[in-house]
């Protein structure tokens, strides 16, 4: 019997095997791919797709990887089959014009039989039906009987990147779980018996636009071995979920739910498997920089988190539970993927926030559904009428409240209702049409023209690292997105030059300003953007005529450039100081380098304290005063990382990178412009520290001349305040504090007066109370009473009435409605809750609200509808109390 290797051992054994055969071991690429055509890394070969398509030269002739992958196209099957996942690891070996079929087949067979110890008699292989070479290699070189080599069609065993381009046949190795059935009944479609574990793709052909296949000049190998699948086989467990890669996560979730996995019913086991699978996907997605949102990969992440929470709820877990689950996932993954522990705080913060928000969504959605059930029941003519939630209502729950359709169906079924799925889909299609119409209004002419021009223009040569002025030739002109031969004075224009000293906006640094000049010509440049390899200068012709083909002198505004350089270098120093003083694991999450300020976003789950900010500011100014000289070098990416250069997380870098090094202080990968010496910055001042998103903080600061401008503006404000308060600058804090105390006392006194007035008015309302059964109901309007005074009056009136219900409304100011409901214990025992009741009444005034079962407040913005809303409240209360 083969050895029961751990998942980690399988991964390392695979990589070591191919490393010993001349393959370069590369780390997993990010789940956020470079390929703009896909949202997520869905296959082991995706990071190498540009090489396979001939768009990039390989750094190594053969490589091997363990690649993180996420696919959600079969998300509904997760947990229901033995091997469907959203997150999985694909082990692969790749050849770029080096070895081909013979070696790939021989090594794959050696690995699975001799290294992993799978019995040859339990393995079956498949080949493309026309690939005689692969068939012969398996039969003659490897020695597999012909009847255990299955010929398959193009749909199963032929790979292509698209309708045209590189393609080729595949060959797969399958494991046989039921060899006792014999070789007479080999059907690779029977996934209860056969499990595909290794896929070999032989890229040897190129398909042209007419569908003709021609041999490739360079033949490539692309393989994939599913780690979870091989772990299932080697560990002798019935499915991928019970391997050591996932099962500890499942056990953690089961423990929280108070379940024993082996004794759980099938539906409970499915929910536990979903949680185990999704936890891994969520962890790696957030670690790779994806944050929950309503678009693109952010929506994929949000959906996965919500499915985790929903399945936890199906297991009876009513409270937040995902943090201990994700901690188990981190423990399992951190040895192979250290970044999951490094980004633990971000992962847990985002997950906890999303979980808590969705639990509120679930609670709100369930309340709304119960109201819908009541409304449908009351509108049914007789018992034969269908108990169905309309597609429009189900879509509103989904679109407005984020309530999943499948959860609407599930709860509806529990209450004997169905959901109009066809109507839901019609509403969804209406939304798609609205989205398409919105997208069609976007003007894409400029980008389209640039894309067309790029086919005829060479890349712009950038001279700005060493030159502030340079001669260039106008290669293209665009006006309102259209290519033109010339532009006259007064017109706005986009200019493409063959060479330029102007820096184009990139890496957070804004583009240069300056001029283009020539014989009788002056063009003011206000911005520079990079479109592919072209630098596009945005400006206006102030004098003369600018023509395509004209030679011009390009001159940047040196004062603006120096300000940008000071702020860019200061940003590097700021990041270095943050890492030293606050947390070495801090990573950049975004930046702005402008002429008048800098903004730096970074990963941190808490605010930076005032003491830390002062230390950071002092350290940066110390480095400035120490006059550290910049060292700029171009080097291989691997060498830069080995030297400790800081890279922006999620940024895509080429094989060669530019490194900005202030030795002993800061070393970063950066394509921006910088000072030659930190002393050129002059001074650095932090002006704000704020939060911009969960787990993301922001520091705004100024450097160089901008510090003086900031201080002058602050002094002006202080002088104005001193004059207004008739106090010296140093006396302002004390004077403001005294005024705040006086204002607070006056407001408190005024509120007390208002409350007393409301109580006096309320006394006169007692006579309006009506008896309903053994209870009393009082619904009334109380003038312009404030919300706080209205609440006091409601509590007072209920106390006077004894058992009953009080609903009061007022118009505290123009355009606003205040409502309050106070219910006694006897009313609550009948099933009426003040919070939900007053929330529904508030909707009639264009608002909402809620609160506790005994006391709740709400508001609206349509005072003209207050009387009507109070009448509805009166009628509903009386009807509800009579019927119960």
From Swiss-Prot:
Zn(2+) binds at residues 568, 572, 670, 674. It comes from the Bacteria. It catalyses: tRNA(Ala) + L-alanine + ATP = L-alanyl-tRNA(Ala) + AMP + diphosphate. Its main location: cytoplasm. Binds 1 zinc ion per subunit. HAMAP family: Ala_tRNA_synth_B. This is Alanine--tRNA ligase.
């Amino acid at each position: 019997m083969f050895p029961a290797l751990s998942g980690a051992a399988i991964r390392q054994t695979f990589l070591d095997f191919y490393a010993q055969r001349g393959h370069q071991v590369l780390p997993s690429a990010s789940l956020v791919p470079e390929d703009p055509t896909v949202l997520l890394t869905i296959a082991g070969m995706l990071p190498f797709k540009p090489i396979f398509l001939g768009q990039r030269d390989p750094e190594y002739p053969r490589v091997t990887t363990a690649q993180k992958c996420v696919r959600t196209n079969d998300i509904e099957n997760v947990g229901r089959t033995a091997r469907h996942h959203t997150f999985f690891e694909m082990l692969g070996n790749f050849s770029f014009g080096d070895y081909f079929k013979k070696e790939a087949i021989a090594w794959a067979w050696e690995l699975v039989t001799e290294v992993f110890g799978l019995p040859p008699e339990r393995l079956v292989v498949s080949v493309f039906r026309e690939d005689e070479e692969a068939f012969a290699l398996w039969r003659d070189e490897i020695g597999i009987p012909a009847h255990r080599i299955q010929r398959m069609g193009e749909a199963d065993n032929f790979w292509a990147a698209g309708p045209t381009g590189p393609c080729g046949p595949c060959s797969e190795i399958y494991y046989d779980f039921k060899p006792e059935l014999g070789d007479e009944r080999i059907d690779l479609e029977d996934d209860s018996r056969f499990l595909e574990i290794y896929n070999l793709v032989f890229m040897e052909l190129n398909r042209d636009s007419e569908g003709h296949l021609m041999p490739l000049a360079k033949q490539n190998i692309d393989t994939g071995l599913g780690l979870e699948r091989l772990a299932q086989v080697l560990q002798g467990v019935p499915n991928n979920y019970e391997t050591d890669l996932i099962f500890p996560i499942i056990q953690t979730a089961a423990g929280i739910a108070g379940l024993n996995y082996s004794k759980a019913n099938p539906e409970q086991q499915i929910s536990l498997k979903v949680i185990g699978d999704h936890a891994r996907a969520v962890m790696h997605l957030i670690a790779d920089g994806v944050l929950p949102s309503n678009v693109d990969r952010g929506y994929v992440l949000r959906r996965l988190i919500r499915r985790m929470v929903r399945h936890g709820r199906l297991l009876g877990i009513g409270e937040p539970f995902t943090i201990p689950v994700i901690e188990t996932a981190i423990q399992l993954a951190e040895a192979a993927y250290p970044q999951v522990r490094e980004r633990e705080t971000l992962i847990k913060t985002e997950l906890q926030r999303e979980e808590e928000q969705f639990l509120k969504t679930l609670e709100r959605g369930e309340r709304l559904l119960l109201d819908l059930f009541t409304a449908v029941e009351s509108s049914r003519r007789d018992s034969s009428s269908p108990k169905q939630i309309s597609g429009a209502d189900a879509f509103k729950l989904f679109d407005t409240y984020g309530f999943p359709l499948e959860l609407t169906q599930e709860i509806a079924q529990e209450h004997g209702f169905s959901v109009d799925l066809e109507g839901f889909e019609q509403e969804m299609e209406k939304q798609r049409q609205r989205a398409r119409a919105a997208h069609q209004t976007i003007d894409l002419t400029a980008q389209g023209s640039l894309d067309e021009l790029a086919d005829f223009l060479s890349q712009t040569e950038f001279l700005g690292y060493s030159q502030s002025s340079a001669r260039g030739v106008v290669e293209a002109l665009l006006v309102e997105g259209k290519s033109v031969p010339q532009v006259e004075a007064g017109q706005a224009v986009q200019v493409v030059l063959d060479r330029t000293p102007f820096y184009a906006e990139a890496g957070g640094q804004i583009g240069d300003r300056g001029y283009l000049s020539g014989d009788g010509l002056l063009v003011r440049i206000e911005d520079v953007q990079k479109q592919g390899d072209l630098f596009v200068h945005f400006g206006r012709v102030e004098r003369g005529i600018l023509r395509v083909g004209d030679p011009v002198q390009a001159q940047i505004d040196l004062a603006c450039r120096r300000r940008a350089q000071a702020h860019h270098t200061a940003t590097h120093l700021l990041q270095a100081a943050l890492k030293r003083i606050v947390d070495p694991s801090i990573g950049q999450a975004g930046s702005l380098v402008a002429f008048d300020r800098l903004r730096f976003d970074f990963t941190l789950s808490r605010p930076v304290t005032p003491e830390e900010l002062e230390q950071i500011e002092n350290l940066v100014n110390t480095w400035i005063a120490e006059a550290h000289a910049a060292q700029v070098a171009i080097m291989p990416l691997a060498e830069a990382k080995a030297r400790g250069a800081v890279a922006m997380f999620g940024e895509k870098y080429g094989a060669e990178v530019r490194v900005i090094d202030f030795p002993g202080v800061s070393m970063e990968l950066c394509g921006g412009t910088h000072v030659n010496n930190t002393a050129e910055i002059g001074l650095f001042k932090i002006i704000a520290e704020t939060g911009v998103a969960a787990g993301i903080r922001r520091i705004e600061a100024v450097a160089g001349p901008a510090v003086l401008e900031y201080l002058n503006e602050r002094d002006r404000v202080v002088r104005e305040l001193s004059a207004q308060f008739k106090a010296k600058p140093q006396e302002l804090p004390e004077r403001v504090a005294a005024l705040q105390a006086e204002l607070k006392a006056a407001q408190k006194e005024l509120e007390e007066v208002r409350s007393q007035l409301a109580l006096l008015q309320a006394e006169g309302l007692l006579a309006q109370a009506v008896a309903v059964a053994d209870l009393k109901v009082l619904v009334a309007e109380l003038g312009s009473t404030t919300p706080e005074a209205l609440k006091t009056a409601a509590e007072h009136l209920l106390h006077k009435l004894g058992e009953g219900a009080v609903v009061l409304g007022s118009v505290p100011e123009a355009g606003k409605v205040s409502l309050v409901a106070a219910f006694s214990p006897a009313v609550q025992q009948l099933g009426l809750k003040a919070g939900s009741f007053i929330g529904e009444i508030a909707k009639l005034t264009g608002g909402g609200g809620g609160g506790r079962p005994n006391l709740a407040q709400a508001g609206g913005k349509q005072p003209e509808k207050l009387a009507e809303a109070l009448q509805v409240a009166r009628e509903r209360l009386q009807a509800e109390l009579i019927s119960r």
